[in-house]
Amino acid sequence: MGDSRETFGPKAFVTGFPIKHSRSPLIHGYWLKTLGLPGSYRAHEVAPEAFADFIASLKDGSSGFAGGNVTIPHKELAFRLADRPDALSQELGASNTLWLEDDLLHATNTDGRGFTANLDERHPGWDRHDTAVIFGAGGASRAIIQAVRDRGFKTIHVVNRTVGRARELADRFGPKVHAHPAGALAEVMKGAGLFINTTSLGMDGEAAPQLDFTPLTADAVVTDIVYVPLKTPLLAQAQEQGFPIVDGLGMLLHQAVPGFEKWFGKRPVVDAALRALIIADMEAH
């Protein structure tokens, strides 16, 4: 029998396709329990062809949800179907957090805030530099480019195997963003103070190319948005070469904070116990 607190209070969700491996219910469940709040948060799988109907049920109240998180492959459609997407969502063309307010469906994207909050927690002062290198130009890189630019970085080099994808991002995010092919990586790393891997290289223990991080500034920070494994091959290489590293788990944890506050009315804290809980779950699967 479930906790009686789940029967009352706001109900929130995470939806995607597939969604069964999401750790978001663990994160929000931890906060509901530690804060002693009524409410529930659960995974709710929705196929792409059913997503518009799901959003309609959210808007008219028949779903019973106060809002929720949206992940792959629904972020772009969530943005388009929301009544009030904010400026972050509008620039990205994607939303990952939805909530009902004044009978309207509002939307934002918290990925960038999760990324910067993770660096603020794990390596304060990371933003004193003005040049960043972003390795990869997939969907995940959009929010990170936006967040790094908005934190004051003057030059952002996006390096991608297919340079056309990187050019699309440069066109979207303005003159501070520069597109480069993979062969230019060593050159654009010179003098950069932040290196961000947004590719899947090294995910789930896959092999990753050997990278020389020494062209970076001596105090540059190297971070990876991949968090399985926690220390990716790229992070291990950077650490071996003497650079401070920040893993990607904190981005997952911190991006969840704004939504929880919207649905349940209290701002939660990313603490060591939550991080340990998620790491234990990762190790168990």
Swiss-Prot record:
CDD domains: NAD_bind_Shikimate_DH. It is an enzyme of class 1 (oxidoreductase). GO terms for molecular function: NADP binding; shikimate 3-dehydrogenase (NADP+) activity. Signal peptide: none annotated. It catalyses: shikimate + NADP(+) = 3-dehydroshikimate + NADPH + H(+). The keyword NADP applies. Belongs to the shikimate dehydrogenase family. NADP(+) binds at G136, A137, G138, G139, A140, N160, R161, T162, V163, G164, R165, I225, G248. Keywords: Amino-acid biosynthesis, Aromatic amino acid biosynthesis, NADP, Oxidoreductase. The active site is at K75 (proton acceptor). Involved in the biosynthesis of the chorismate, which leads to the biosynthesis of aromatic amino acids. Catalyzes the reversible NADPH linked reduction of 3-dehydroshikimate (DHSA) to yield shikimate (SA). It holds the Pfam family SDH_C. Homodimer. Its EC number is 1.1.1.25. Pathway: Metabolic intermediate biosynthesis; chorismate biosynthesis; chorismate from D-erythrose 4-phosphate and phosphoenolpyruvate: step 4/7. HAMAP family: Shikimate_DH_AroE (MF_00222). This is Shikimate dehydrogenase (NADP(+)). GO terms for cellular component: cytosol. GO terms for biological process: amino acid biosynthetic process; aromatic amino acid family biosynthetic process; chorismate biosynthetic process; shikimate metabolic process. The gene is aroE. Shikimate binds at S22, R23, S24, T71, N96, D111, Y227.
